[in-house]
């Protein structure tokens, strides 16, 4: 069989297995996830041995230190993967939940019931922990999942997927409900994206180039998990102590994640006082600032920002900064340059906070809180598959419910349409 034929078979088998997954009880799904967690912990030496092969190959290819760190698995990270499986097992099962019921004038009762999406394709890079994280969420929501990890993690991903599939076999659950595309070539991704007959949705997780490639080549609907160009606007009525604390946390706690702050906007009425203060605080923490002319007027030595800086997701200790005339200009800047991810306003003005919440288009909008709260666990959703920047079908951190859809259910007593 050719690569194209093999991938088509994987997708077709996943479609067949998805029907069995949709029927599986919550208890059966939870037992599976708990056994999977135990299997990962019990086989940590196998996983780390395969991971060592990937790390060695990555070093030979000249992967960056940051990439190698994302790729690396040790005992503590494997335990975290196992704990993640247990956390998903403990979450309420959304499948079969009836979310609304209402009675029509003709006495039929109408409701909406949560059902699995079907077959979910996940395309991701570097992090082999996504193999177990994504599998857990998709399976708990009653879906089949087709995984395609990065070529740099092929041995790690195959080892993890193999251990998870072993537990499915032992419980009599179709192994095809959890499939890993074993072909590291980019052609494997291209063929996967052609399987619209069998795969219901594609969720890509990775860098900007991967997302663009998937969107341009997919025949299947895509839920984009695009870059995080996250903003904070310091309003004229902001408490400076609060603003400084939130900005530092948003930018420096974990600068390499998608909910880290990338652009700071400051109201002109407080620029003369606040810009020098935040410049000093961030410089002490080794943050490189790139400012517009108005910002640099109060922060000598700051590098001039270019148009490209307003679009940039730095993922490091670099921050673009701009002084704006008012709330209108702040909102306009965010809606022009943002990536629909996460934005915050620091203000004591209730009316301004409400306008910001209503008019900013992003998936998570905060008032007087760090952008780092844009996370499924932090928002009370439990584990997440990622943060969607696509308004259809889900927007923002995607938990279990977002891996389902709804259907209408109708109860009658013999009614016919007149």
Curated annotation (Swiss-Prot):
Task: Give the highest taxon in the source lineage.
Answer: Bacteria
Main subcellular localization, coarse class? Answer: cytoplasm
The keyword Translocase is assigned to this record: no
Q: What does this protein do?
A: Catalyzes the NADPH-dependent reduction of L-glutamate 5-phosphate into L-glutamate 5-semialdehyde and phosphate. The product spontaneously undergoes cyclization to form 1-pyrroline-5-carboxylate.
Identify the stretch annotated as signal peptide in this record.
Answer: none
Q: Where in or outside the cell?
A: Cytoplasm
Instruction: List the GO terms this entry assigns under cellular component, sorted alphabetically.
Output: cytoplasm
Q: Which CDD domains match?
A: ALDH_F18-19_ProA-GPR (cd07079)
UniProt keyword annotation of Iron-sulfur present:
no
Show the Pfam families listed in the entry.
Answer: Aldedh (PF00171)
Give the family per the record: Belongs to the gamma-glutamyl phosphate reductase family.
Query: Might you give the EC number(s) for this enzyme?
Result: 1.2.1.41
| Name under which the protein is recorded | Gamma-glutamyl phosphate reductase
Write out the GO biological process terms: L-proline biosynthetic process
Pathway annotation: Amino-acid biosynthesis; L-proline biosynthesis; L-glutamate 5-semialdehyde from L-glutamate: step 2/2
Keywords from the UniProt entry: Amino-acid biosynthesis, Cytoplasm, NADP, Oxidoreductase, Proline biosynthesis
- Identify the species of origin: Geotalea daltonii (strain DSM 22248 / JCM 15807 / FRC-32) (Geobacter daltonii)
Q: Which GO terms describe its molecular function?
A: glutamate-5-semialdehyde dehydrogenase activity; NADP binding
The record lists the catalysed reaction(s) as: L-glutamate 5-semialdehyde + phosphate + NADP(+) = L-glutamyl 5-phosphate + NADPH + H(+)
């Amino acid at each position: 069989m050719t690569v194209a034929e093999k991938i088509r078979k994987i997708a077709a088998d996943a479609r067949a297995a998805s029907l069995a997954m949709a029927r599986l009880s919550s208890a059966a799904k939870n037992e599976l996830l708990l056994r999977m967690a135990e299997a990962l912990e019990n086989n940590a030496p196998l996983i780390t041995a395969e991971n060592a092969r990937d790390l060695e190959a990555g070093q030979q290819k000249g992967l960056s230190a940051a990439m190698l760190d994302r790729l690396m698995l040790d005992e503590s990270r494997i335990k975290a993967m196992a704990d993640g499986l247990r956390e998903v097992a403990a979450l309420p099962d959304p499948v079969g939940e009836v979310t609304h019921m209402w009675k029509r004038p003709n006495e039929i009762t109408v409701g909406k019931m949560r059902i699995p999406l079907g077959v979910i394709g996940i395309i991701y890079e570097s992090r082999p922990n996504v193999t177990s994280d994504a599998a857990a969420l998709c399976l708990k929501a009653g879906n089949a999942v087709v995984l395609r990890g990065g070529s740099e993690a092929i041995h790690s991903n195959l080892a993890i997927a193999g251990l998870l599939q072993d537990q499915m076999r032992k419980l009599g659950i179709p192994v095809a409900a959890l499939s890993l595309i074993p072909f590291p070539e980019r052609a494997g991704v291209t063929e996967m994206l052609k399987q619209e007959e069998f795969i219901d949705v594609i969720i890509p997780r990775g860098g900007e180039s991967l997302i663009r490639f998937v969107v341009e080549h997919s025949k299947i609907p895509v839920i984009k998990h695009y870059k995080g160009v996250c903003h904070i606007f310091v309003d004229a009525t902001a408490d400076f102590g609060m603003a400084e604390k939130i900005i530092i946390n948003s930018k420096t706690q974990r600068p390499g994640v998608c909910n880290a702050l990338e652009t700071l906007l400051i109201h002109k009425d407080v620029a003369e006082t606040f810009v020098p203060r935040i410049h000093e605080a961030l410089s002490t923490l080794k943050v490189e600032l790139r400012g517009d002319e108005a910002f640099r007027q109060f922060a000598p030595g700051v590098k001039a920002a270019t148009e490209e800086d307003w679009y940039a997701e730095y993922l490091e200790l670099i921050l673009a900064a701009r002084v704006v005339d008012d709330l209108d200009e702040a909102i306009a800047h965010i809606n022009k340059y943002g990536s629909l991810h996460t934005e915050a306003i620091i203000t004591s003005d209730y009316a301004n906070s409400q306008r910001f919440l209503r008019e900013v288009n992003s998936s998570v909008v905060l008032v007087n809180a760090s952008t780092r709260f844009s996370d499924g666990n932090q928002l009370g959703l439990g584990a997440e598959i990622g943060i969607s920047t696509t308004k259809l079908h889900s927007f923002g951190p995607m938990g279990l419910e977002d891996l389902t859809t709804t259907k209408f259910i109708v109860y009658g007593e013999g009614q016919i349409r007149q």
